[in-house]
């Protein structure tokens, strides 16, 4: 990576500003999934071990007005982080002001402080989300000229807490998580070991047009599953029953199929039901057609067998988006079959691009079998599309 990293700067005795992604699910004050906190630990521990004084910034959820602040404080995160690190995490509970400044100035080497939810600054004019120059300058002034961005999940956004701070410090560098995310995803797309197979699921073609086009030029095969497969199948003249479809994208789907020249792999059969919720009948189709009154909610046995064929010998696999409604046990066999087909390939570099695919791998017990699971759905999508991430572009060149 052509950007400075946390290992390139002297940290001892410095107040080091760190953007992390602690946007974790919290229910009744309890964190229900702490993966993002765990993912940030290597960078945080390194800064503390080097004698840095870590000042952490993160958002949590969306905050547009005062009422939205309920349940959005980072207080439970400070507590969880303290337990994981085995040391106190100072939490003044504010995003600016004399109390915060005093607490930061009192930090000693190897100590850590967490600033309150950066999106609390969005209540009065979206200062965080719109990268208010004064806010970025103020937050930058709280440190000693070093900013570490380790929040890949927000790297595709230009906010005051990443791009804004970067513009007002001497050195803006990447943390270990950000460095790894870029290394795995960018390298997989730009310099893959071949055969390179990309798998795209999810519901809408419109969400992934740029990704499909970029990957068609880079991958040896692009497997399409999930809801967006039905738009491609309808474009080819197949019956899709009451399945999800984007009729306004049929011409685009035809164009992509022509451009793909056989690289796009679609389902061969489906697991269907007579309703999305409250269904009374579930069955497998004999082929690519779906009968009237039924909707496709997963791929079926022929497609799962085809996944094994298509993935045989693959050396690089990038997967973004489930191929069925995996949250429902009736419709998770396709996603499980796909994961099985990926992880059994010898020597494969297997990468999951965050979001629902990551949730599927974690919930279904496959997480530790993949080479890398991204922490950022939107950011990984933009990398797969070949876009420049603002949070990364703002870092200091080597």
Swiss-Prot record:
The reaction(s) this protein catalyses: (2R)-3-phosphoglycerate + ATP = (2R)-3-phospho-glyceroyl phosphate + ADP
Entry's Gene Ontology cellular component terms: cell surface; cytosol
GO biological process assignments: gluconeogenesis; glycolytic process
Ranges annotated as spanning the membrane: none
Cellular location(s): Cytoplasm
Top enzyme category: transferase
Annotated InterPro entries: Phosphoglycerate_kinase, Phosphoglycerate_kinase_CS, Phosphoglycerate_kinase_N, Phosphoglycerate_kinase_sf
Binding site for substrate: 21-23, 36, 59-62, 119, 157
Broad class of the protein's primary localization: cytoplasm
Enzyme Commission number(s): 2.7.2.3
Keywords: ATP-binding, Cytoplasm, Glycolysis, Kinase, Nucleotide-binding, Transferase
Quaternary data: Monomer.
Protein name: Phosphoglycerate kinase
Organism of provenance: Lactococcus lactis subsp. lactis (strain IL1403) (Streptococcus lactis)
Gene: pgk
């Amino acid at each position: 990576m052509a950007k400075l990293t946390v290992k390139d700067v002297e940290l001892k005795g410095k107040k080091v500003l760190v953007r992390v992604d602690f946007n974790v699910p919290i229910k009744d004050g309890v964190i229900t999934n702490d993966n993002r906190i765990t993912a940030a630990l290597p960078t945080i521990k390194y800064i503390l071990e080097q004698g840095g004084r870590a000042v952490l910034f993160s958002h949590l959820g969306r905050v547009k007005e005062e009422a939205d602040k309920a349940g959005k404080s980072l207080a439970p995160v400070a507590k969880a982080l303290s337990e994981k690190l085995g040391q106190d995490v100072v939490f003044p509970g504010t995003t600016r002001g004399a109390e915060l400044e005093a607490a930061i100035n009192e930090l000693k080497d190897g100590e850590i402080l967490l600033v309150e939810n950066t999106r609390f600054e969005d209540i009065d004019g979206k200062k965080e989300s719109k990268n208010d120059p004064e806010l970025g300058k103020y937050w930058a002034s709280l440190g000693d000229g070093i900013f570490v961005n380790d929040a890949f999940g927000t790297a595709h956004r230009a906010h005051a807490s990443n791009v804004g701070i970067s513009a007002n410090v001497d050195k803006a560098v990447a943390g270990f998580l950000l460095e790894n995310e870029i290394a795995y995803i960018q390298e997989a797309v730009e310099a893959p070991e071949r055969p390179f197979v990309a798998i795209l699921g999810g519901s809408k073609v419109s969400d992934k047009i740029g990704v499909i086009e970029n990957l068609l030029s880079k991958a040896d095969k692009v497997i399409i599953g999930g809801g967006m497969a039905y738009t491609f199948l309808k474009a080819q003249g197949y019956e899709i029953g009451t399945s999800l479809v984007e009729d306004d994208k049929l011409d685009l789907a035809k164009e992509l199929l022509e451009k793909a020249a056989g690289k796009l792999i679609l389902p061969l059969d489906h697991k269907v039901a007579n309703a999305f919720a409250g269904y009374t009948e579930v069955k497998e189709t004999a082929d690519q057609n779906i009968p009237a009154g039924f909707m496709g909610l997963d791929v079926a046995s022929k497609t799962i067998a085809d996944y094994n064929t298509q993935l045989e010998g693959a050396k690089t696999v990038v997967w973004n988006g489930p191929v069925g409604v995996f949250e429902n046990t009736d419709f998770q066999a396709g996603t499980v079959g796909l994961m099985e087909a990926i992880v059994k390939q010898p020597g494969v570099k297997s990468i999951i691009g965050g979001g629902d695919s990551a949730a599927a791998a974690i919930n279904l017990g496959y997480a530790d079998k993949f080479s890398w699971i991204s922490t950022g759905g939107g950011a990984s999508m933009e990398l797969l599309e070949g876009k420049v991430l603002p949070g990364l572009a703002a870092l200091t060149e080597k």
